UniProtKB/Swiss-Prot annotation:
The gene is Mex3c. This is RNA-binding E3 ubiquitin-protein ligase MEX3C. Interacts with USP7, which antagonizes the ability to degrade mRNA. GO terms for molecular function: RNA binding; ubiquitin protein ligase activity; zinc ion binding. It comes from Mus musculus. Transmembrane segments: none annotated. InterPro entries: KH-I_MEX3_rpt1, KH-I_MEX3_rpt2, KH_dom, KH_dom_type_1, KH_dom_type_1_sf, MEX3, Znf_RING, Znf_RING/FYVE/PHD. Binds RNA through its KH domains.
Length: 652
């Protein structure tokens, strides 16, 4: 048997094609049955035991050799297949040569047995590979063995794992090995990531990533910038900030920036903080708003009047602008808390009102339709009068000025003058309401508003339509001589108890006399040293002070001619400005009620005002009195002396 084996081996080697490149051949194996063959059989038996294969008949002669030949054939086939794909290294030369020789020797003799053994070996190898599929990551993540053990076969693993050294794996090879040995993609990726993390240089990569995040945060913080945006004036600041900061809050939200507004008294500079592009957008918005406001102011100043109180050219067709000048101390009063008062006036009158700034003249600019502008001006003046309690002081500076109008005897006109005899400090002064006319008529719906005393007698304002004489309530006015104009008549200390005797007759009383043409005779000054003990509702001049009216009458006579025979009538109501005043005397003076009473007829004082005269439109009468006026031979309005055609009833 040994000689036949040698001959068969020689013939197979001669007829075989050129083999793949092999390492240098080792000496030929000894004959079968020698000590080397026994050693090879032991080695194969150990490998079979490690692979879980039991020797079915160890005592049978020749069985170890057959089993060894079968294992060698399977190993050679797998090695050749893996060499073709480039995955397996070359086998050791000695093992490859001996096993190939044994394979070739037994091919011709025992083909059937070899095929059966090959089938059994392949089935068992597939079972073991299926078992190893559950733990591919254990193979990949196992720590590298010692250098001496790297070349030794690893028992218990598949055949490919025996031939592949564990220390030569990198991340890509680990992932490929995981897929090769049955592991799915998720496990292979996990193995690759873990091997990369625990591999050489993994700690340095993590530190580099951390440093990169910190650098990004620092760069993000460093992109914030701060820029100052100046505007022309504090008025521009107020326009940009808006009421209660509404505009600047919207700008902050729109641009995603923080905008610090300048404080009153500081430089008008906005400080904007945020990202560079956001700051640039906020700066453009602020400068655009400031430029827009500057253009509005420029056009307003161009069209504005040179003198206060005159209307300028309208901004829109049909609109006009009027400047209303007020005292410095009441600017805030007109504006109101947070602009509530001026806003209410704008809404009620349908106008646009520009409030004056602190460093400008106290002038309100009212823009709108002419009738609305007049109403707004009246509302402003009425609010000032009601809140401040406008009153007249008898001093040298106040020469009978009332509401900006100099009421005097200039120009040959005798204006009616009513004042209280004993003015008190402003805290105790009664309010002199400054009710203006409504645009619907000369007196308007509020023309009869007044404060009445205990005898229901109103004290009226200086202006009066009857400009031809001086009008007093009560009995006949004593003659006024050119030497003495100051009077001290006790007839005015008490009021008549019947109001009808005052209003209904309208009879002329003694005319004023003594107004001579010689101005030199009117220069005498006479003063009284006694203070009246009781306040008076009459127009009696105070005894301690010479009234400016008397002083003006002496210095400026009405005209060169004599005014003799001027009839004196009791005025029903004043025309123009309905400004009524009540007595502001001491404790014995009549005080106004807490609330205004209903509008009573100015003739009978009994019925409510429900009628108006046509065409003048004075709605001051009850229907009965209005009809009586129309039934007269020459019907005329008691207020303006205009001819009356009819009386109409007012439904409110």
């Amino acid at each position: 048997m040994p000689s036949g084996s040698s001959a068969a081996l020689a013939l197979a080697l001669a007829a075989a094609p050129a083999p793949l490149p092999q390492p240098p051949p080792l000496p030929p194996p000894p004959p079968a049955g020698g000590p080397e063959l026994e050693g090879d059989g032991l080695l194969l038996r150990e490998r079979l035991a490690a692979l879980g294969l039991d020797d079915p008949s160890p005592a049978e002669p020749g069985a170890p050799a057959l089993r060894a030949a079968a294992v060698a054939a399977a190993a050679a086939a797998q090695c050749q297949a893996r060499r073709a794909t480039g995955l397996a290294p070359e086998e050791p030369g000695r093992l490859a040569t001996s096993e190939t020789a044994e394979l070739e020797l037994e091919v011709d003799e025992e083909e059937g047995e070899e095929a059966e053994l090959d089938g059994e070996l392949l089935e068992e190898e597939e079972l073991e590979e299926a078992e190893e599929e559950d733990r591919p990551s254990l193979l990949l993540l196992s720590p590298p063995a010692a250098t001496a053990s790297q070349t030794q076969p690893i028992p218990g693993g598949p055949l490919g794992s025996v031939l592949l050294p564990a220390a030569g794996f990198d991340a890509r090879e680990a992932a490929a090995a995981g897929v090769l040995y049955g592991g799915d993609d998720a496990q292979g990726m996990m193995a690759a990531m873990l091997s990369h993390a625990y591999g050489p240089g993994g700690g340095g990569a993590a530190a580099a990533a951390l440093n990169g995040e910190q650098a990004a945060l620092l760069r993000r913080k460093s992109v914030n910038t701060t820029e100052c945006v100046p505007v022309p004036s504090s008025e521009h600041v107020a326009e940009i900030v808006g009421r209660q900061g509404c505009k600047i809050k919207a700008l902050r939200a729109k641009t995603n920036t923080y905008i610090k507004t300048p404080v009153r008294g500081e430089e008008p500079i906005f400080v904007v903080t945020g990202r560079k592009e956001d700051v640039a957008m906020a700066k453009r918005e602020i400068l655009s708003a400031a430029e827009h406001f500057s253009m509005i102011r420029a056009s307003r100043n161009k069209n504005g009047p040179a003198l206060g109180g005159l209307s300028c050219s309208p901004n829109l067709p049909g609109q006009t602008t009027v400047q209303v000048r007020v005292p410095y101390r009441v600017v805030g009063l007109v504006v109101g808390p947070k602009g509530a008062t001026i806003k209410r006036i704008q809404q009620q009158t349908h106008t646009y009102i520009v409030t004056p700034s602190r460093d400008k003249e106290p002038v309100f600019e009212v823009t709108g339709m002419p009738e609305n502008v007049d109403r707004a001006r009246e509302e402003i003046e009425m609010h000032i009068a009601m809140r401040t309690g406008n009153y007249i002081e008898l001093n040298e500076e106040n020469d009978f000025h009332y509401n900006g109008t100099d009421v005097s005897f200039e120009g040959g006109t005798l204006g009616s003058a009513w004042l209280s005899s004993n003015p008190v400090p402003p805290s105790r002064a009664r309010m002199m309401s400054n009710y203006r006319n409504d645009s619907s008529s000369s007196l308007g719906s509020g023309s009869t508003d007044s404060y009445f005393g205990s005898n229901r007698l109103a004290d009226f304002s200086p202006t009066s339509p009857f400009s031809t004489g001086n009008f007093w309530f009560g009995d006949t006015l004593p003659s006024v001589g050119s030497e003495d104009l100051t009077v001290d008549s006790p007839a005015f200390d008490s009021l008549p108890t019947s109001a009808q005797t005052i209003w209904t007759p309208f009879e002329p009383v003694n005319p004023l006399s003594g107004f001579g043409s010689d101005p030199s005779g009117n220069m005498k000054t006479q003063r009284r040293g006694s203070q009246p003990s009781t306040p008076r509702l009459s127009p009696t001049f105070p005894e301690s002070i010479e009234h400016p009216l008397a002083r003006r009458v002496r210095s400026d006579p009405p005209s060169t001619g004599n005014h003799v025979g001027l009839p004196i009538y009791i005025p029903a109501f004043s025309n123009g400005t309905n400004s009524y005043s009540s007595s502001n005397g001491g404790s014995t003076s009549s005080s106004p009620p807490e609330s205004r009473r209903k509008h009573d007829c100015v003739i009978c004082f009994e019925n409510e005002v429900i009628a108006a005269l046509v065409p003048c439109g004075h709605n001051l009468f009850c229907m009965e009195c209005a009809n009586k006026i129309c039934e007269k031979r020459t019907p005329s309005c008691p207020v303006c002396q205009t001819a009356v055609t009819q009386a109409i009833q007012i439904h409110s």
